[in-house]
Regions:
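Flexible "cap/lid" loop of the alpha/beta hydrolase fold
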Residues: 78, 89-117, 167-170
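Conserved loop-alpha-helix segment in the C-terminal half of the alpha/beta-hydrolase fold
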Residues: 156-189
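Short beta-strand/loop motif that positions the catalytic acidic residue
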Residues: 148, 154-156
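Gly/Ala-rich beta-loop-alpha elbow adjacent to hydrolase catalytic centers
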Residues: 69-77
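Active-site nucleophile elbow and catalytic-triad environment of alpha/beta-hydrolase enzymes
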Residues: 128-145, 167-168
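Catalytic histidine-centered segment of alpha/beta-hydrolase-like enzymes
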Residues: 189-198
């Protein structure tokens, strides 16, 4: 089987992709799930600097691979796309929302995240997650401004409504910065679209792969 690497979001689990993975298998692809640093199977991965994060990413995913990335994992894949040089990059509901929507500061975000991890006794290293959040968010660069040179499919949820409107407006404002990016909203989905509608998400991915890779075996 061919392979896609799947970079998780914060709080995502391997179990969450089970139906998505089955649908991917139907198209001849296996999915290798990767927890972000500080989380679950990668709880002991320490990130102290941007270089640590780049080295971790490079050790997990070979250059030129097919990559799917969700939420915080999407922010990682987008920011460090030049190190991945992905053959095909699929972004699931990430790389587009900044603090201007959430109306909070980086410090507030980190405090809330650490409290959530502690209160729910999650198998995470709160300090590593906090550092990861700081690295990605202190000087946030969205998908339209990182200079993507990789064929990229951005799949976005359309709920809740106020986030949907934010996304549509951001796309409209950045219509001149969309080289290499194809965008599709998944109807009647919220953030974890691959959990809610695994078949529809996978079908959208492979429709796109067929259109953009019609002369290759993707």
């Amino acid at each position: 089987m061919k392979k896609f690497y799947f970079i998780s979001g914060l709080g995502s689990t391997k179990e969450s992709i089970q139906y998505f993975e089955k649908e991917m298998n139907q198209f001849g692809y296996e999915v290798q799930y990767i927890d972000i640093p500080g989380q679950y199977t990668n709880q002991d991965v320490k990130i102290q600097s941007e270089q640590d994060l780049i080295e971790w990413l490079s050790s997990e995913i070979p250059v030129g691979s097919n990559v799917i990335a969700f939420s915080m994992g999407a922010d990682i894949a987008i920011r460090y796309h030049s190190y991945l040089q992905a053959r095909n990059l699929i972004i699931l509901d990430g790389g587009i929302i900044d603090y201007d929507l959430m109306n909070i500061t980086l410090e507030e975000d980190i405090t809330m995240t650490k409290s959530y991890i502690k209160e729910n006794q999650l198998d995470m290293n709160a300090e590593t997650i906090a550092k990861l959040t700081s690295l990605l968010r202190e000087q946030y660069i969205d998908i339209f401004h990182v200079g993507l040179d990789t064929k990229t499919l951005l799949l976005l949820s359309d709920h809740p409504d106020f986030v949907y409107e934010y996304k549509k407006n951001k796309i409209k404002v950045n219509c001149d910065n969309m080289d290499h990016i194809d965008i599709q909203f998944m109807k009647d989905t919220s953030h974890e679209m691959y959990v809610e509608k695994p078949r529809e998400v996978v079908e959208s991915i492979f429709d796109w792969l067929q259109r953009t890779n019609h002369k290759s075996n993707y």
